[in-house]
Each structure stands twice: as structure tokens, then as C-alpha cells.
Amino acid sequence: MSRFFSIEVAKDYFNFASAHFLIFPDGQREPLHGHNYQVSVTLEGEIDHAGVVLDFITFKPLVKQVCDALDHRTLIQTESPIIKVNRRGQEIEVRYKTQRLLLPRQDVILLPLVNTSTELLAEHVADQIRREVRKKFPHARIRSMEVGVEEARGQRGMFRGEF
């Protein structure tokens, strides 16, 4: 019989407050606005000799660190074919049709995404967590990860992928 184990972390302090905008399928841009995002993470894998997939005490700070990197920033997608993003010294310029947004560089996180949807933000958070877990816990035997990014109560994007 196969045995499957997982851990889930979903703490109130796994959050980030960020501004963003989406480009809709028809090419329209929604207004710049913000959310107080909440993050949850589930890891599935084999348990180690101590009987754990990964120790909560050492894993939680890693998730918090990933959330903190996005906190109080404007999230800009750099892979959208609809907008143009230019780095100009201490500023980030975003062009959409005839509109121009100019933001201080230190207030922006440029993300290699086509959009800043909760689904793609969940994948980005998962990628960051995966990189850090592999670095800090190289012997962990994790098979898959699921990340949820909630932008409003009961409204969340999910990503699930192999580890």
C-alpha cells in the first residue's frame, strides 16, 4: 500500500499587501489597485527518519520570507505582450496604449509573468519556495507543492506542481 504524507501551512502572517493591475483577455487594463494577499502552502512527500515531510519550525520562516519580498510593492508583469516595461535609472515606466505609469524603482517588483493574476502569483510564490527549500533542505523528499494566493476572503488562485 502506498503512503502519502503532506504538511500545510496557512498562517495569518503569510501575507503581502501589494498593488497590481491585470490585462484582460480583450486587451483592456484594469485600474491600478491593491490587495491584502494571504498565502497557503501544502507540501506532499515522503517522511524522513523523524517522521516528518518538513519541520514546521524551519519551514514557516521561509514562507514568510517569500511573502515579505512582495510586501508593500507594486507588482508589474514583464512578459505581457500588451504593456511595455522600461527601467529608467531609479524609475520604472509602464506603457499601455497611450497611458504611461511612472513608479519609483524601489517600490516595484518586476515579475517574469504575462499577468499578475492570483494563479500566476501562486506559481511565482511556489517557484521561490521551491528554490529556497532545495537550497536549505537538500535532503527533503518532496514530490509536489500546492500554493494558494487569496486576494479576498473566499477568492483565491491556486498552483499545484511537481517539486
Regions inferred by a protein language model and the residue ranges of each:
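Charge-rich, low-complexity N-terminal segments
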Residues: M1-F163
